[in-house]
């Protein structure tokens, strides 16, 4: 069997994402965006990776040995039209068809570094979903929606006609 290798001309920087734990997903991930990987500003090796509402922080680590990223494709050079009408269940003819198919590997890139995420993910809450004025979310002083905290007692509840169990 001959293996043909061709190199693509466009240079891309490839990384391995080294995550601790496991990712759970539903459905097919084919042609889907897994997350957003960004390089932190004013740093050389720090990256952040946002998956859904989780954010991971990692560092760029060089690999001991580089890895080659390749893509396998099958080439069918069978020009004989008599074999096209035969069924694939015929073992003798199926072996002949496999010999006519050649495999080609194209080099997509070389991976020299990995981004290693060693800490647990932090939860990312968009600023628009935070309600200021609650005891858990202190309002910044520059916010126009600043609500001064009001002490609520059973006798001075903001709810109309409150019912309390005594």
Swiss-Prot record:
Region named Disordered: 73-101, 126-166
GO biological process: mitotic sister chromatid cohesion
Residue ranges, compositional bias (Low complexity): 73-88, 134-154
InterPro entries: Ctf8
Biased composition regions of type Basic and acidic residues, renumbered to the chain: 89-101
Segments crossing the lipid bilayer: none
GO cellular component: Ctf18 RFC-like complex
Biased composition (Polar residues): 155-166
Protein's UniProt name: Putative uncharacterized protein DDB_G0287975
Organism: Dictyostelium discoideum (Social amoeba)
Lineage: Eukaryota, Amoebozoa, Evosea, Eumycetozoa, Dictyostelia
